[in-house]
């Protein structure tokens, strides 16, 4: 039986955020193949001596020299930080899997220790980058400390170490192929449990539409802890709050959305972090979901989900990546165009 090892920072939650759902999708894909699926935590042994810790630190120093290269860490601060980050995990990973016939699924592409050590241990590496981190606004490379997008080449070189690479969007697949990586397109689709919920919402929406009267309503939805999403949500709030003659209601909700600058307006309702029940209630009621993001990488999972739920999506050009030219995804370039579409 094939052994699959995965280490992911995302909790496998079919009802969680986009990263968690993508992780569940990948897990369901592999478990369906009847493999030995190991969710690795890379935790240290509970009891270890000071001498053992010193040996690990020394081995880590040598591992970085051999497999990573100290020249990749720009500045003394980054070198010290790297040693502390890698110190205990590298030998643990290496000793545990050296010489074993395994396949390692690399999802958290900012986690370099597991990549380099699994490669050194002889594992087959399959990468599932949730997005190209170097192209996400505000992201900083942990080795060079470069700001996005100026460490794209570093990220590409790391992905070249992998045996297979599966990208979440058409655009990223195309870009990686231009760099000589034989990337394949593996789009997001909700885990089974989440898909069932969205199909239920679609059925309820179909019933509500038969009897709905009155003004329209739209939902601005997203996680305010995600920098591009937060920026886009705030831009939408600022725009709609400046409009004095809105003929429809705007709802704003999502994880930590209460931390946004919620400007008062008679036609805007702020719901903050939504319970599952409240989210379902809004998705059944509203006439569409509005999305705005600065240009970034990856693909928005909620566009797929809302299409399954029968929800029209109004997305700016940057947010609509991977979903252009679909009949129920309405793309706008300016807020003036958005108003016309609504």
Where are these regions (language model features)?
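N-terminal subdomain of nucleotide-sugar transferases
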Residues: 1-50, 240-244
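Active-site proximal beta-strand in glycosyltransferases
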Residues: 103-105, 118-138
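Acidic donor-binding loop of glycosyltransferase active sites
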Residues: 163, 284-298, 309-311
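Nucleotide-sugar-dependent
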Residues: 14, 228, 290-303, 314-325
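Conserved catalytic-core segment of nucleotide-activated headgroup transferases in glycan assembly
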Residues: 188-264, 270-277
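Membrane-proximal helix-turn-helix segments that form the acceptor-binding/catalytic region
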Residues: 84-99, 113-114, 127, 133-134, ...
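Donor nucleotide-sugar binding/catalytic pocket of nucleotide-sugar-dependent glycosyltransferases
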Residues: 134, 156, 160-206
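A short, glycine/small-residue-rich beta-strand->loop->alpha-helix junction that serves as a flexible
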Residues: 8-25, 82, 106, 226-231, ...
